[in-house]
Amino acid sequence: MNNQKQQKPTLSGQRFKTRKRDEKERFDPTQFQDCIIQGLTETGTDLEAVAKFLDASGAKLDYRRYAETLFDILVAGGMLAPGGTLADDMMRTDVCVFAAQEDLETMQAFAQVFNKLIRRYKYLEKGFEDGVKKLLLFLKGFSESERNKLAMLTGVLLANGTLNASILNSLYNENLVKEGVSAAFAVKLFKSWINEKDINAVAASLRKVSMDNRLMELFPANKQSVEHFTKYFTEAGLKELSEYVRNQQTIGARKELQKELQEQMSRGDPFKDIILYVKEEMKKNNIPEPVVIGIVWSSVMSTVEWNKKEELVAEQAIKHLKQYSPLLAAFTTQGQSELTLLLKIQEYCYDNIHFMKAFQKIVVLFYKAEVLSEGPILKWYKDAHVAKGKSVFLEQMKKFVEWLKNAEEESESEAEEGD
């Protein structure tokens, strides 16, 4: 037996090719740019031909790797340096957004080019979104005309869903806001967006990314008021956006009022303090009394754990509401407020089945406590009620309404005799 180790064969002199997947391709955006610009130069300004060229080139060129360069070219005509400037020594093309005509129709046509490209190569979605976010941060480096074109294009792309409204975060950049660039850009953007859709669709998109309550941040802190926002955008021809923001602020103020009101009630704060607070909030946020009485009613009804037994809940409700009558009475100084309260009571009793038999008792209690008066009660009975539980509640109120009518007639005849 040979104990010597057998010599293993050597592979000297052999050359091996690296597997393709192991090769690191050099990152060369300049070469990619030259290929795209050459192709765009050949297609000219025919955007149909541009879209076809981009579609075909995706099979030969690495769009995934050079997405940023691709979108720089299509928007600005070439690769952008930090700050948004085009390098002087680089190739550039006039077949781009910034070199096109400054009108909505042209930007709509360019939007179609982007739509087709991203539909064809879905992986470009993220790169495009990132590219637009970057372009928005570079706004100061662009001319006013270039900013206007980009704003119109972005508005159209937001409307057709190619872009997500989260890209608007870039507009809250401190320097852009401070110099008024963000607000001016937003005017053009929202005009084209609302032109494609309506304000409700715009609002839904903003809500989806929690941007609906941030629009005032387009202005510096010392100008972040509803008054300044509505004046600026109304004068720019965007009254619907101004009204939307005003409504958003009102809704926010109402929610805050209800939250604070419930906390004050649970603490057992004196009614005079609660009334004072609510009246200050009404004045500060321009909330009308009929709206406030609805908030007060909801707050009052949410402060108690109701009995599940129908025969006991009416008694519990009367006892509870008797206690809160002075608070409710403070916000039914107008006929419309009383009518609103009646409708709120009707809806509540219908939605909470244990309260179905308590409706008339609540109304009578409020009449005696001077929360409600005969005029609004009679109007509610005649034609101002809603459909919810209508037949049940009208039947409950029949005798009381007859008594009110008789009392009213007696008062009128007494007044005539006095004359």
From Swiss-Prot:
Polar residues bias (residue ranges): 1-15
UniProt xrefs under PROSITE patterns: W2
Residue span, W2 domain: 247-414
Keywords, comma-separated and alphabetical: Acetylation, Activator, Isopeptide bond, Phosphoprotein, Transcription, Transcription regulation, Translation regulation, Ubl conjugation
Top-level division of the source organism's lineage: Eukaryota
Modified residues (N-acetylmethionine): 1
Gene Ontology cellular component list: cytoplasm; membrane
Gene3D superfamilies listed in its UniProt record: 1.25.40.180
Keyword Ubl conjugation annotated: yes
Stretch list, region Disordered: 1-26
Cross-link (Glycyl lysine isopeptide (Lys-Gly) (interchain with G-Cter in SUMO2)): 368
Modified residues (Phosphoserine): 12, 411, 413
Keyword Cytoplasm found: no
A biological process from GO: regulation of translational initiation
SUPFAM superfamilies noted in UniProt: ARM repeat (SSF48371)
Protein family: Belongs to the BZW family.
Stated role: Translation initiation regulator which represses repeat-associated non-AUG (RAN) initiated translation probably by acting as a competitive inhibitor of eukaryotic translation initiation factor 5 (EIF5) function. Enhances histone H4 gene transcription but does not seem to bind DNA directly.
Cross-referenced PANTHER family: BASIC LEUCINE ZIPPER AND W2 DOMAIN-CONTAINING PROTEIN, EIF5-MIMIC PROTEIN 2
Protein name: eIF5-mimic protein 2
Organism: Pongo abelii (Sumatran orangutan)
